[in-house]
């Protein structure tokens, strides 16, 4: 029986090692390809488009006994796509092409202050992600001109502490809930200007405010949440589109419909916040 258990453990470790090898090769290949891009290239879109077709899989950061950095380029959700592409962009801009450089960049984006110290140290609300990464100098939230940034979001987050049963780590470690609740209180009350849904269809206004490769954070009116979905801005002939890891399409796609039409199909979506990766 012990022998069988050891074999199973060995197989799992082997599969994990193979996955890590695939991920590291993917990252190094993409960073190598980025060296050939002209200085005028939109690096966030260059990298994001490389992931089109990758399967949408949620919760890929969960399930580890001890919190650690997870690199998974094979399966993405809306948040991990944004983090993966942003980390690649930062590396390419700084001419850092090693896998270790990428892991440092990803750690800095995903964990508060760039330090891994248990599950609560991971940034779980995108508003805090913006605040933390603005503080570290890697992104800037665009909140002007007005119009189109005519609306103000007053953040009120408590979804995780109010629904701990929805999160594996909180079910297994109820002591984390108090820490998460403290973070929620710190983030709540902050105000940010955003573009309301009704103005997202105004191409003339948006052209002056949103650029290719900007991170789009879709605001919502769902109780306890700040952001419903994430993706990257892509301008096409008919208007602004969203490149995202789509739960609906079950893969990474550049949405065929305009972002305005996309938002209209989701009554709880109220508008968009715009975050730009610093150069």
Residue ranges and their predicted role:
Residues 1-24:
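Bacterial Sec-dependent N-terminal signal peptides
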Residues 10, 188-191, 208:
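Sequence termini and other peripheral, non-core segments
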Residues 20-36:
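Short N-terminal segments immediately surrounding and downstream of signal-peptide cleavage
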Residues 31, 40-55, 61:
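Sequence/structural signature of beta-propeller domains
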Residues 34, 38, 68-75, 221:
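Short, charged/polar micro-motifs that form catalytic or ligand-binding hotspots
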Residues 56-193, 235, 239, 244-247:
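Acidic/His-rich structured neighborhood in mature extracellular/periplasmic domains
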Residues 194-206, 220:
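Short alpha-helix capping/helix-loop boundary micro-motifs
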Residues 211-279:
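C-terminal soluble interaction/assembly domains
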């Amino acid at each position: 029986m012990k022998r069988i258990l050891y074999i199973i453990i060995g197989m799992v470790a082997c599969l994990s090692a193979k996955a890590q090898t695939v991920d590291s090769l993917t990252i190094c290949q993409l960073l190598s390809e980025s060296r050939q891009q002209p200085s005028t290239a939109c690096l966030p879109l260059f990298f994001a488009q490389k992931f089109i077709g990758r399967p949408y899989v949620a919760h890929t950061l969960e399930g580890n006994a001890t919190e650690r950095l997870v690199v998974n380029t094979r399966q993405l959700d809306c948040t991990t796509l944004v983090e993966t592409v942003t980390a690649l962009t930062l590396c390419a801009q700084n001419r850092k092409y090693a896998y270790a450089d990428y892991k440092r960049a990803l750690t800095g984006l995903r964990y508060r202050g760039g330090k891994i110290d248990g599950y609560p140290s991971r940034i779980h609300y995108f508003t805090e992600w913006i605040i933390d990464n603005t503080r570290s100098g890697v992104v800037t939230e665009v909140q002007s001109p007005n119009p189109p940034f005519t609306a103000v979001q007053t953040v009120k987050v408590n979804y995780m502490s109010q629904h701990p049963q929805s999160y594996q780590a909180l079910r297994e470690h109820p002591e984390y809930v108090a820490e998460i609740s403290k973070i929620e209180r710190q983030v709540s009350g902050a105000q940010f200007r955003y573009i309301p849904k009704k103005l997202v269809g105004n191409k003339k206004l948006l052209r002056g405010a949103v650029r290719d490769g900007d991170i789009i954070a879709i605001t919502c009116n769902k109780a306890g949440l700040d952001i419903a979905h994430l993706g990257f801005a892509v301008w096409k002939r008919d208007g602004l589109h969203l490149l995202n890891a789509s739960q609906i399409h079950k893969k990474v796609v550049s949405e065929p419909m305009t972002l305005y039409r996309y938002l209209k199909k989701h009554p709880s979506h109220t508008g968009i916040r715009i975050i730009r990766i610093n150069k």
